[in-house]
Design a protein with these regions (language model features):
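RNA pseudouridine synthases
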Residues: 1-182
C-alpha cells in the first residue's frame, strides 16, 4: 500500500474491499476519504458483481452438474488462518462453471454471491477440486504460517468487478488484464 501511494502520489488512497493476499487481480481503491464509506457499503450490501477465475482439477463426474450453485455455512476453524464448513443455514454462495478443460485441469468461472473469508477456496476444495497451488485447502502446508512461498502462486484471479457508482450513478465494469492459462 505504501508503494502504491508513493507511485501514484495519492496519499489518501485506500482499498474499499479485500482479496486474499495470495489472490491475483483486481482491487478497487477510493481516493477521497469522504466517499470511502459509500463504496465500502456496496461490498457490504452485496451490490458488487464479482467474478473470479481459478485453475483446478477437472472432474468428469461433476461435468454434468455445471453450472453449480454452491452454498454452505463457513466459519473459522480451530486451525490458524483456516476456515471450514459447518452445519447450519448457508452464509456463503458461489456460482461455479467450467470455462475450458485441458487434460486433468480446468479453468473455472466463479461468481460470488457473498464474500466470506476464503469462500472460493473452501467451496472448490469441498467439491473435490481444490484450486491449483492452494497451500491452505484442503491441507494446510506447514510453511504457510511462518514463511509465505510465492514460487508457485495460487491459481485464483479476481477477474471482474461491476457496480453502480454510489456518487455519480454511473455503471462501472472493470476487468483485469491478467489471465490464468491452462
Amino acid at each position: 500500500m505504501v508503494r502504491l501511494k508513493k507511485s501514484t502520489g495519492i496519499e489518501t488512497l485506500s482499498p474499499i474491499h479485500r482479496i486474499d493476499r495470495e489472490t491475483a487481480g483486481l482491487v478497487a481503491f477510493s481516493k477521497r476519504p469522504q466517499d470511502r464509506n459509500a463504496y465500502q457499503a456496496l461490498f457490504r450490501d452485496k451490490s458488487v458483481k464479482k467474478i473470479y477465475q481459478a485453475i483446478a482439477p477437472f472432474r468428469e463426474d461433476l461435468q454434468k452438474r455445471f453450472p453449480i450453485h454452491y452454498q454452505s455455512r463457513i466459519e473459522e476453524s480451530s486451525v490458524f488462518i483456516k476456515m471450514h464448513e459447518v452445519s447450519g443455514d448457508p452464509n456463503s454462495d458461489t456460482w461455479i462453471d467450467i470455462e475450458e478443460v485441458r487434460g486433468q485441469w480446468a479453468r473455472y468461472s466463479l461468481k460470488l454471491g457473498t464474500g466470506k473469508k476464503h469462500q472460493l477456496r473452501v467451496h472448490m476444495s469441498s467439491l473435490g477440486i481444490p484450486i491449483k497451488n492452494d497451500q491452505i485447502y484442503p491441507v494446510l502446508q506447514p510453511h504457510v504460517i511462518t514463511n509465505k512461498d510465492f514460487s508457485e502462486p495460487l491459481q485464483l484471479l479476481a477477474k471482474e468487478l461491476s457496480f453502480v457508482d454510489p456518487i455519480s450513478g454511473l455503471k462501472h465494469h472493470f476487468f483485469s488484464s491478467q489471465a490464468l492459462h491452462l
